Amino acid sequence: EKIICGIQDLIGEKNRYREKMLTITPYAKTGMLHSMIAGNAAADNVGKFLDENYLDLIRPYFIVSVVNFAYDGTPAMREESHKREIEELFRTVTDIFSTDEVNIVYYFRDIYNVFLITNFETEQEMDDLFYQIHKYVSTAKSNSYVTMGVDIVRDDIGELKQACEGALKALDSILTEGRETVYFLEDTEDC
C-alpha cells in the first residue's frame, strides 16, 4: 500500500501527468518499477522517484497483462538460465510488438510471471495484440505452458495496483478453464 501511495504521489494530477509525458521504459527495463511495486527498492532509490514524475506513461491509456509460465519438470535447478532466457525473450517481445502508436514495457517478477504494460494513445480494442504476443511467447518457450491474464483499459496511473490485480484476477481463469490461452478480465463474470 505504501508503494502504491508513493506511485500515486509521483504522478500527481492528471493534467500534470499529461504535460510531463516522460517514459517508463528505461525504468521498467532496469527493474526499478518492479522493485518499487514489489517493495524491494532501497529508500534512497524510491526517493529519486519522488523528485519528478519518472513513472509517467508516454500515452494516456494502458493495459497491464501478466504472462504466466508453467514448466514440465522443475526449473529450479536452472532458475538463473531460465531468468536470462525469459528476460531476453521479453526484450525481443517489446522490440517486435512496440510501434509508434503502441509502447510495451515489461517487468520481470520471477521465472513464472512477467508483467507487461501496453501503453497507447487512443482507447481501442487490443485483444489481437495480446493473442499475437501469446502466440509468439508460446512458440519461443515450447518447453512450458504459457497463459496470459489481461486487465481492462485504464487511463489513470493511480490505478496501477488495480491493473496488476486485474491481470492476476483474469489469470485466475486457469483454475476453471485451463492453461495455454489468453484470459481477459472483461470476460470474467464478476469483473
Label each region the model flagged.
Residues 2-128, 154-159, 164-175, 180-191:
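Interdomain helical linkers/hinges and coiled-coil/dimerization scaffolds
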Residues 150-152:
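Short Trp-Ser/Thr-centered turn/loop motifs at beta-strand boundaries
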Residues 104-111, 135-148:
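Catalytic core regions of nucleotide second-messenger enzymes
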Residues 96, 133-140, 170:
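Conserved short hydrophobic interaction patches
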